[in-house]
Amino acid sequence: MRMLLTARFNTEAANQLVTEGTLSKIIEGILEHLKPESSYFTAMEGERTCFIVFDMTESSQLPTICEPFFQVGAKVAVRPVMNAEDLRTGLSQYPG
């Protein structure tokens, strides 16, 4: 299932990781593990934020997906998402 992970990094904790040179290594490890369809990075309400679209085949994967973010104090949200083709398919099945 296509999922959207949003992670917002605590500014002080992320600043420390940047100073130590480890934030980029952590992000690269996460991306290598998830093999995302796409990933985007921005600032949101004063926090470093990433949006990662990836495929999750089983809910039991959730702990290993989220834990690297939790370890650095990030706030994480994961939710299923659709692309336009998924939406068309879903709407075509609506009986109304």
Regions found by a protein language model. Name each.
Residues 1-96:
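Conserved, structured core segments of small domains
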